Amino acid sequence: MSAPAKRRCRGPAADLDSSFQKRLRKISIEGNIAAGKSTLVRLLEKHSDEWEVIPEPIAKWCNIQTSEDECKELSTSQKSGGNLLQMLYDKPTRWAYTFQTYACLSRVRAQLKPISAKLHEAEHPVQFFERSVYSDRYVFASNLFESGNINETEWAIYQDWHSWLLNQFQSEIELDGIIYLRTTPQKCMERLQKRGRKEEEGIDLEYLENLHYKHETWLYEKTMRVDFENLKEIPILVLDVNEDFKNDKIKQEYLIDEIKSFLTS
């Protein structure tokens, strides 16, 4: 298994010195809806002071308010009374382009946030992102286009905007590796129904199957065409999480060990 590659430092970030940039590893955790990403990032956050987790900014896409500091500030859509995630599922043809554009923007903002002082002092600092700007495009936006919810003009504009935006911040948002939580669409549906988020009530199995296919061709079979050079050879760790691990200490230890090996081998 190859180690996560070091990113090319094309320019100094305002709050990072070159030594820290060379040490820092940025890893995205990818997977279908309800695959277990949130459960895993909570485990990672507790495991090491040298690991920092950036959760999916779902609170900025809907009317959910949590006690976490990064979720207290209302997004523009919330201030205007909007719940973009709910709007997407209710009227996907109307809101798909709007949602995917805002989702990508919110992820870029999350990845550009200043590094914590504690992580800056770490010998082997790692940032784990719950999904990435790449799955926004190659999984979710692509699926919405193929299902007819994003039209050809919107898709062309989205791809152009996405490529331009990522190229502007390439050195700051490039990933060093991807962890793919692999599970069946049927298992995801079970977990989705169990957690009972209001915005997800309309999700059906076919939608999860389509997202599963996208993840498989991109991260497992590696047959999907991608437009960013760093993605073509990026190290990928595939973890089978079809069996629930939320309350399974043995499975949790196994997953942590696999991730540690991925980071250091």
Curated annotation (Swiss-Prot):
Active site: 130
UniProt xrefs under Pfam families: dNK
EC number: 2.7.1.74, 2.7.1.76, 2.7.1.113
InterPro entries, A to Z: DCK/DGK (IPR002624), Deoxyribonucleoside_kinase (IPR050566), DNK_dom (IPR031314), P-loop_NTPase (IPR027417)
Gene Ontology MF annotations: ATP binding; deoxyadenosine kinase activity; deoxycytidine kinase activity; deoxyguanosine kinase activity; deoxynucleoside kinase activity
Tissue-level expression: Expressed at high levels in adult intestine, spleen, thymus and testis with lower levels in skeletal muscle and eye. In the embryo, expressed at higher levels until day 10 with lower levels in later stages.
Catalytic reaction equation(s): 2'-deoxycytidine + a ribonucleoside 5'-triphosphate = dCMP + a ribonucleoside 5'-diphosphate + H(+); 2'-deoxyguanosine + ATP = dGMP + ADP + H(+); 2'-deoxyadenosine + ATP = dAMP + ADP + H(+)
PANTHER family assigned: DEOXYCYTIDINE KINASE 2, DEOXYNUCLEOSIDE KINASE
Record function comment: Phosphorylates the deoxyribonucleosides deoxyadenosine, deoxycytidine and deoxyguanosine. Shows highest activity against deoxyguanosine followed by deoxycytidine and then deoxyadenosine. Shows only very minor activity against deoxyuridine and deoxythymidine.
Annotated protein name in UniProt: Deoxycytidine kinase 2
Organism: Gallus gallus (Chicken)
